[in-house]
UniProtKB/Swiss-Prot annotation:
Signal peptide: none
Protein name: Pentatricopeptide repeat-containing protein DWY1, chloroplastic
Job description of the protein: Plays a major role in single RNA editing events in chloroplasts. Acts as a site-recognition transacting factor involved in the edition of the site 1 of ndhD (ndhD-1 site corresponding to cytidine-2), which is a plastid-encoded subunit of the NADH-plastoquinone oxidoreductase. The interaction with CRR4 is required for its function in editing the ndhD-1 site.
Gene from which this protein is expressed: DYW1
Annotated stretches, region: Type DYW motif: 145-239
Positions of the UniProt region annotated as Disordered: 40-59, 101-122
Disruption-associated phenotype: No visible phenotype under normal growth conditions, but the mutant plants lack editing of the ndhD-1 site.
Cofactor annotation comment: Binds 2 zinc ions per subunit.
Gene Ontology BP, a term: chloroplast mRNA modification
Length: 239
C-alpha cells in the first residue's frame, strides 16, 4: 500500500484497481493514514517525497503533521522525519497545549475536587509523581497477567525491544491514569485529556485496565472521546 501526497491533493492507492482522491487537508489526511495503518499495518504505509512540501502552509499546529512525520519514520526515514519537525518549529508553529502546561504531550486529570493536576511529556509538573510511577509499574504487571502484550511497533525510536516496552509503559496518559487511581476512591471515573492521538498500545492497555480496576476511564485525545469500560472502548477500536 502506498500513500502519496502532491501539492494540493492526497492520493491513496490500494492493491485493487481503484484510487481514492480527496482535497489535501490535514484532518482528511489523518483519517486516510489512520485507516490505511489499520488495514495494512504501519510497515506497508509509505510516503512520497512530496509529503512535506506543504507543512508550513497547511498546518496551524505542529502536531497536525505527526501522521506525515510518522510515515517517514515508519518507512525508515528518521532523518527526514526529524527535519520535518524541525522545519515546522523553526517557522514558529507552536506545539499544542493542555491548560497551562506546554510539553510534547500534555494531559490533565482532576482530583481532589476542582484542583487540576497536570502531567506531560517531561513528567515534571505532576504532584507525587514517584508514587504514580510505582503504581504504574504495579498496574503494568496486573495488565500483563490479564493478557496484555506490548505492541512495540508504536515506538518509532531506533532502540531495542526492552527499551521500547519501557517507553510504552511511560506514555504520559498512563502516568496520568495511575495518578488518578491512587488519588480517587475505588470505582471512581477517571477523566484524562490528551492533546495527541492515543497510540494503539495505550488504547489496548487502558481497555484491559478498565476491566481490572472496574472503573470507567475516559480519555479525550485530539480526535474523540474514548470511554473505556469492562475491557471495551466506545470507539470500537477505530478512531
Amino acid at each position: 500500500m502506498a500513500l502519496e501526497a502532491a501539492f494540493s491533493m492526497s492520493f491513496c492507492s490500494f492493491s485493487v484497481p481503484k484510487a481514492i482522491f480527496c482535497e489535501r487537508e490535514t484532518s482528511s489526511f489523518q483519517r486516510i493514514t489512520s485507516r490505511a495503518k489499520g488495514i495494512a499495518g504501519e510497515s506497508q504505509v509509505q510516503s512520497s517525497d512530496g509529503v512535506e512540501t506543504q507543512v508550513k502552509e497547511t498546518s496551524p499546529k505542529v502536531f497536525d503533521k505527526l501522521p506525515e512525520r510518522n510515515l517517514d519514520t515508519w518507512s525508515g526515514g528518521r532523518e527526514t522525519a526529524r527535519g520535518l519537525s524541525g522545519s515546522v518549529v523553526r517557522n514558529t508553529v507552536r506545539k499544542d497545549t493542555t491548560l497551562r502546561h506546554i510539553s510534547p504531550s500534555s494531559h490533565s486529570t482532576k482530583v481532589r475536587g476542582d484542583k487540576p493536576e497536570i502531567s506531560g511529556g517531561e513528567k515534571k509538573a505532576i504532584v507525587d509523581r514517584s508514587k504514580a510511577y510505582v503504581k504504574l509499574k504495579s498496574l503494568g504487571k496486573e495488565v500483563r497477567d490479564a493478557g496484555y502484550v506490548p505492541e512495540t511497533k508504536y515506538v518509532l525510536h531506533d532502540i531495542d525491544e526492552e527499551a521500547k516496552e519501557k517507553a510504552l509503559m511511560h506514555h504520559s496518559e498512563r502516568l496520568a491514569i495511575a495518578f488518578g487511581i491512587i488519588n480517587t476512591p475505588p470505582g471512581t471515573t477517571i477523566r484524562v485529556m490528551k492533546n495527541l492521538r492515543i497510540c494503539g498500545d495505550c488504547h489496548n492497555f487502558i481497555k484491559i485496565l478498565s476491566s481490572i480496576e472496574d472503573r470507567e476511564i475516559i480519555v479525550r485525545d485530539n480526535k474523540r472521546f474514548h470511554h473505556f469500560r469492562d475491557g471495551n472502548c466506545s470507539c470500537g477500536d477505530y478512531w
